[in-house]
């Protein structure tokens, strides 16, 4: 390769290089290093060699158009978790193609993509699909990892493919999965880990251009706001370009519909805005949101893509931890005993109403508030309730259903996590990133057993679609809460109160949605 204008190294090779494998040997002074291409679109198993592929074979997979989506409902899942257990009735377990299997049922209940369509969610968010460290792709059943150990931003993870050694398998099967969801009317958002790499020194980025891609402290140590050993420097031109390139590949080649930016507070506001603008050129309904936490990275407070700077990022959603804590109680390991409004704790009416109405005291647009009670991180909602209360299990079940309904009927973007609709438990584990399939897997039999609860979640999602969420006002009296959408009013009863108040305010043509207790 020869150095071109602008510092780019390039080589032109005549002939058809489809299926060719390659790696870089970079010589600096007396040292030489070998690495994969950080801009490659695919690789062989375990990131051994980069591969040349024809993007046309990905784009050529037939897709279906989707109508615009103005009120998202997100469902987070892990590709492996959803279908890895023996209760999954399909052929493929823990693979991209498992979501392409139509007509799968368990005792009459739809499974897989059919289940997600039945539930009524608009978006499925998958945990990282970029190639990551932590799973032996040749023997994926031997190890487990969520995927927050990025090796490549542009290469799909091979352990979810049927043949990790074939560079075409992972790219075509991922694209087929996206298309299968689109056929069900479901959009796909990808959990994009753009804030760090698994191993700074051995990363393709650092071996290609040492030190350039990362933030460094004055003493020469890497900035570590991610608590993963390094922070990528989003303000550097080629880092930002890599992020935009990642978006191009995901939206154009694979047809995804949104990005969840992991540890978004590591990135700067300008970069996040550029990611949004580029995404909107491909999909006018593109959904961009992330974790706007104030991370201790080497970046000025006024430039962090954090909740504190949300006004600088129009159209960017943020996970609303205030909604989470008010409704269910504290989430960290040291706060499991804390109760929220719907788990029996004491909160002022003003605090409760504020988060139900879109947290306008935090966000300048309620559409920026991603309202959630459970995600892949921390305890499941069921484990949290069991930790903070000694109430009978039946009471806790009612509390969980009521929380989910309150979230789905609140202003903002509701965010569900796979399994919370059947009271999934991780046995009290608060960080199950490598805990294995038995802990993390989606139990379709349990889902079938709790199908009545699943139907309640489905009905709440269906009700939300009929409501004018922008007009929501919440009123309270005698311990009851009235959600007023103009022509429809819904009463939530978080305690043991009379139902007379609810009946008196509902017009004769209205519908009352009440818990029995």
Predicted feature descriptions by range:
Residues 2-3, 141, 147-148, 257, ...:
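Active-site-proximal helices and loops of the catalytic beta/alpha 8
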Residues 17, 66-71, 117-118, 281-282, ...:
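Extracellular/periplasmic catalytic domains that process cell-envelope and extracellular macromolecules
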Residues 73-75, 124-126, 188-190, 259, ...:
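Hydrophobic faces of well-ordered beta-strands that scaffold small-molecule active sites
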Residues 79, 128, 190-192, 196, ...:
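A cross-domain feature marking catalytic cores of carbohydrate-active enzymes
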Residues 24, 77, 126, 153, ...:
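Conserved, mostly hydrophobic/aromatic
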Residues 366-506, 512:
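Loop/helix patches that line or flank the sugar-binding groove of alpha-linked glycan CAZymes
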Residues 80-254, 271-283:
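Substrate-binding/active-site clefts of carbohydrate-active enzymes
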């Amino acid at each position: 390769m020869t150095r071109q204008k602008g510092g780019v190294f390039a080589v032109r090779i005549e002939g058809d290089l489809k299926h060719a494998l390659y790696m870089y040997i970079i010589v600096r002074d007396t040292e030489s290093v070998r690495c994969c291409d950080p801009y490659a679109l695919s690789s062989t198993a375990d990131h051994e060699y980069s591969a040349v592929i024809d993007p046309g074979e990905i784009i050529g997979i037939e897709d279906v158009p989707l109508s615009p989506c103005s009120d998202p409902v997100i469902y987070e899942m892990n590709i492996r978790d959803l279908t890895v257990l023996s209760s999954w009735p399909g052929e493929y377990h823990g693979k991209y193609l498992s979501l392409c299997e139509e007509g799968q049922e368990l005792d009459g209940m739809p499974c897989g993509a059919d289940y997600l369509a039945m539930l009524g969610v608009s978006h499925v968010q998958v945990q990282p699909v970029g190639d990551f460290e932590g799973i032996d792709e040749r023997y994926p059943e031997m190890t487990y990892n969520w995927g927050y150990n990025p090796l490549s931003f542009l290469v799909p993870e091979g352990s979810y493919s049927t043949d990790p050694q074939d560079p075409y398998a992972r790219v075509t099967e991922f694209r087929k999965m996206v298309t299968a969801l689109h056929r069900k009317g479901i959009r796909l958002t990808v959990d994009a880990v753009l804030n760090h790499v698994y191993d700074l020194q051995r990363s393709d980025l650092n071996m290609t251009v040492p030190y350039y891609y990362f933030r460094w402290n004055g003493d020469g140590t890497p900035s570590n706001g991610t608590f993963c050993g390094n922070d990528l420097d989003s303000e550097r031109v080629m880092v930002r370009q890599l992020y935009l390139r990642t978006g191009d590949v995901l939206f154009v080649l694979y047809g995804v519909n949104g990005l969840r930016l992991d540890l978004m507070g590591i990135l700067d506001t300008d970069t996040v805005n550029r990611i949004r603008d580029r995404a909107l050129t491909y999909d006018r309904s593109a959904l961009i949101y992330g974790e706007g936490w104030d991370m201790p990275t080497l970046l000025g407070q006024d430039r962090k893509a954090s909740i504190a700077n949300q006004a600088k990022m129009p159209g960017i959603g943020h996970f609303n931890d205030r909604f989470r804590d008010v409704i269910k109680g504290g989430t960290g390991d040291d706060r499991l005993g804390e109760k929220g409004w719907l788990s029996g704790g004491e909160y002022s009416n003003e605090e409760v109403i504020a988060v139900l109405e879109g947290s306008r005291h935090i966000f300048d647009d309620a559409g920026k508030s991603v309202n959630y009670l459970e995600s892949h991180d921390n305890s499941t909602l069921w484990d949290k309730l069991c930790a903070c209360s000694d109430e009978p299990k039946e009471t806790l079940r009612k509390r969980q259903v009521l929380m989910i309904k309150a979230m789905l009927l609140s202003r903002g973007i509701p965010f569900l996590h796979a399994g919370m609709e059947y009271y999934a438990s991780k046995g009290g584990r608060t960080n199950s990133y490598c805990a294995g399939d038995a802990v993390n897997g989606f139990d379709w039999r349990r889902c079938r057993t709790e199908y009545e609860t699943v139907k309640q979640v489905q009905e709440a999602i269906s009700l939300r679609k009929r409501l004018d969420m922008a007009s929501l006002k919440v009123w309270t009296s005698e311990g009851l809460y009235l959600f007023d959408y103009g022509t429809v009013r819904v009463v939530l009863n978080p305690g043991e109160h009379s139902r007379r108040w609810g009946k008196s305010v509902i017009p004769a043509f209205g519908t009352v949605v009440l818990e029995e207790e």
